[in-house]
Amino acid sequence: MDAPPILYFPNANSRPTYFTIHNVHEAWAISKGEGVKVGILDHSFGYDVHEDLYAGGNNFQKGDWGKSFYNESHHGFWMASTLHEIAPDAEIYALGTYSSDESDKVDAMVQAIDWAIANNLDVLTYSAARFSPENRVRLDSSVDRALAKGIVTTFIHYPHPGNILPTWLGPMTGDDDREPDLNILHYDYSVVFTKRYADWMQHGTAAGYRPFLSLSSTSPVTAGFVALLKSVRPDLKPTELKRILMETSRATIFEGKESPRTVDIAAAIRSVTKPRK
């Protein structure tokens, strides 16, 4: 399908955004993530196309998925763009890990996590499906190593107790095996997939927020918030960062749904930069 001559996004200028919901502009007065290295575990980064977006990276994928790392701009590029918008001074590392075979994907993720440890990354983020119990064992062991080295993880649908588990502005979903730690706005306006949107327009359903609905983006947004904090307090450990983000969050109601811990990143940064007694 050819792209339509115009893309219309109703109420685009008056919608709540990450910046209004989570007080990002106020946080930017203190930090934009400078000096923090964030790795994204994903696919289709357009690594050779968007060279200015990435500080580095590595491709651990096999076959056709491996080819998508370099020239195809899709999910990984989307997540990187979202992260860059939240923490524009952070260094972004593209780590190609996706496969339609879960075992191969976890193999790639384990390699990527080891690479992140060796290259002194500060944060790792993942935005895809939950894992089966048999593959969780290998992944948990790898994440344990990362956490022990001070690397913060923000993985959706991943209930490891050391992981910062984000979710949407709403109640716990069926894909989470424990109560999420943080609530994040789940509408992302940075990227729209044109064919999908054109399909919605053709069927008369392209209205409201629908083309921007994104649980995926809650993970890189959370990673961006961690980067803002780590930039001003690089000594903070993963457990401390989780505690700070949770303790400074607030209860909200959005679209009629209650969220117990909506991130207020400005409050979080103020809490770690106020003069110590």
What are these regions (language model features)?
Residues D2-E91, Q111, A118-V123, D176-N183, ...:
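Active-site core segment of subtilase-fold serine proteases
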Residues F45, A128-A129, R196:
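Short glycine-/small-residue-rich Rossmann-like dinucleotide-binding loops
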Residues Q61-D64, L83, G96-Y98, H157, ...:
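Residues at the C-termini of beta-strands that transition into short coil/loop
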Residues W78, T97-L169, Y209-P220:
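Substrate-binding/access-modulating region of protease and related hydrolase catalytic domains
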Residues L83-E102, L236-T252:
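Short helix-loop-beta-strand segments that form the rim/entrance of peptidase-like active sites
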